[in-house]
Swiss-Prot record:
InterPro entries: TBORCS5 (IPR018780). It comes from Bos taurus. Myristoylation at Gly-2 mediates attachment to lysosome membranes. It is a lipid-anchor. Belongs to the BORCS5 family. GO terms for biological process: lysosome localization; organelle transport along microtubule; positive regulation of anterograde synaptic vesicle transport. As part of the BORC complex may play a role in lysosomes movement and localization at the cell periphery. Associated with the cytosolic face of lysosomes, the BORC complex may recruit ARL8B and couple lysosomes to microtubule plus-end-directed kinesin motor. Thereby, it may indirectly play a role in cell spreading and motility. The modification Phosphoserine is found at S71, S75. Residues 1-22 have a biased composition (Polar residues). The keyword Membrane applies. The keyword Cell membrane does not apply. This is BLOC-1-related complex subunit 5. A lipid is attached at G2 (N-myristoyl glycine).
Amino acid sequence: MGSEQSSEAESRPNDLNSSVTPSPAKHRAKMDDIVVVAQGSQASRNVSNDPDVIKLQEIPTFQPLLKGLLSGQTSPTNAKLEKLDSQQVLQLCLRYQDHLHQCAEAVAFDQNALVKRIKEMDLSVETLFSFMQERQKRYAKYAEQIQKVNEMSAILRRIQMGIDQTVPLLERLNSLLPEAERLEPFSVKPDRELRL
């Protein structure tokens, strides 16, 4: 903006304002006028050792696909553009289509085999699950019967304890009776074991 005003002032030399000298504030500051408070620590940077610059230099140059349409150009240059042959592009597309069709058939075949195998596995798992369920029910019945056996064993132990406490009392009572009224010695063991 300042340069435009100065050029306008030069183009109108007969103007009344042209004789006015610019104020000292509009003068550019000289290096002598600048006071440096603290010198900054700005090391001299060597661009050739910068890793980013080295990586950018390692990128290979390449030409655009359609020569003549470089960035910034709106219309192609007078150089003859290379054109693609439509028949070859069509053959390329047809080959690619055939390749995709073959890949799709292979995937569909594998998918069908996988679905069939999954159905077989589902059937096997269902059969195994029903078998295990029946076995679990059977074992639950066995566990219930074992629980009954344990209960009966506890009852028999209590009966045995009662007999063990009662037999000495019976023997004592029997010893207090007269000789003619005494009973035979009481025994829980069967007669077979007594005879042996």
